[in-house]
Amino acid sequence: MTVIIQGRSFPDDLTQYAEFIGQGLLSPEEMRRIDQNAQALGISGLELMESAGTGLAMAARQYQPGKILILCGSGNNGGDGMVAARHLAGEADITVFWYDSGRQTDSTRTQLQRLLSCSVTSIPFRSRDDLIEHTRIFQDTDLIIDALLGTGGTGSVREPVRTCIEFANNAKAPILSADLPSPGIIPDRICAFHRAKTEGAHIYGIGIPLLAEISTGPGDLLILRNRNPDSHKGVGGNILVIGGGPYQGAPYLAGLAALRAGADIVRVVSPHYLPEPDIIHVPTAGDRITTADLATIIPLCKQADVVLCGPGLGPESHDVITSLAPYIRKGVFDADALRDPLPVAGESLYTPHAGEFARMSGLSPGKTPRERAHAIMKAQILGTVLLKGAVDVICDGSRVRFNQTGTPAMTTGGTGDVLAGVCAALMAVVPAFEAACIGAYVTGRAGELITQTCGYGMTARDLLTAVPQVLFRSTSERE
């Protein structure tokens, strides 16, 4: 029996995979990733908000307050506070100050409509003067709940939220912060949802599935940033692909994939020229890349943001890659670059299938995703490994992530070259581990889309057309 998640099978005993949950404090960015992935698994944002607000109400009851003042921002943290107010209505005298910014999230707007049907005092504020008018309420309460910013708080706090925090700190009542204290506020207690984001927090579960944390998903793309309107050529990445010889098309597929994933400039060092006008071809002397070509390639490695080595290279040219590695700041190593001795760049990403992993590490990768994760950690490779399979395993030696997107139709030749190219483009803008997670997720989803129309007739070139549909549609939806 298996559990089917996002098109690929996963072992049904997921309790074995709890060991891959990250340890320590959770960053706000990581929590947003998990939240988004939970929604992709069918847990709606409203459901998560209801669970968070219920936990916040439970924490508030421990104070046994007669009067509660709840301060709600316009983001999802404010929605958590509104849910808590609804649950506490009738148990205490509830006053809700909510920031009427005109930019509430959809979920918070829904919770506000629900709140207005409850027996609570609801007071919108738009300015510092609105708060000054109600200063007395801050002093005449038994508990203040801070649901102003939470994990959404970044940078300096602006008015009128700054005054709201000032008045809360000057009040006599204890402050209970929802999830993460708003910047500048001094809480008596922190009610953290799912996992702690700061020391001393009390954790309340909100029903987030395990796979939302340990698997890739649309939330992984949140780290990507849209380009500024004044961006210039090169800001998306200058990628160098080194490959070709026995297999002429592989480096070009990888280069085109990098372009489709947002790279601005792609050069391909290869013995053979294929007419691809979007790619800059750098020829080598013979039918294979040899050490005689180092003088040509080394300056290009120094110039590139990311160097992708290996597609279509052939084993005879492996010594060239090991000689180039010291000159590579960020490197993606695939195919015939995955041999002993393993090349190590300043920052390295390795993209082996099971056989290549065994060849480069001397270890059996195992069969299950769990066994493969342990094999990568045991190998102690200096970099991030994306071990391809029915379920891809991404590991940087400490963090582990699983990717379940994809389809059996992706066994067609060249899909690994596309994945490597996508990862190279992403690595120009994010670290290797994140590039591997996003690259695996996006390439797999692209394969799922193409399979709907092409079935098992899909080619790697077909995959190129779907990569930007997945990657940049998801990017625009974050706006």
UniProtKB/Swiss-Prot annotation:
It comes from the Archaea. Residues 1-214 are annotated as: NAD(P)H-hydrate epimerase. Keywords: ATP-binding, Isomerase, Lyase, Metal-binding, Multifunctional enzyme, NAD, NADP, Nucleotide-binding, Potassium. (6S)-NADPHX 2 binds at G312, D417. Residues 353-359 are annotated as: NADPHX 2. One of its GO terms (molecular function) is ATP binding. GO terms for biological process: metabolite repair; nicotinamide nucleotide metabolic process. Bifunctional enzyme that catalyzes the epimerization of the S- and R-forms of NAD(P)HX and the dehydration of the S-form of NAD(P)HX at the expense of ADP, which is converted to AMP. This allows the repair of both epimers of NAD(P)HX, a damaged form of NAD(P)H that is a result of enzymatic or heat-dependent hydration. This is Bifunctional NAD(P)H-hydrate repair enzyme Nnr. The lineage of its organism: Archaea, Methanobacteriati, Methanobacteriota, Stenosarchaea group, Methanomicrobia. The gene is nnr.
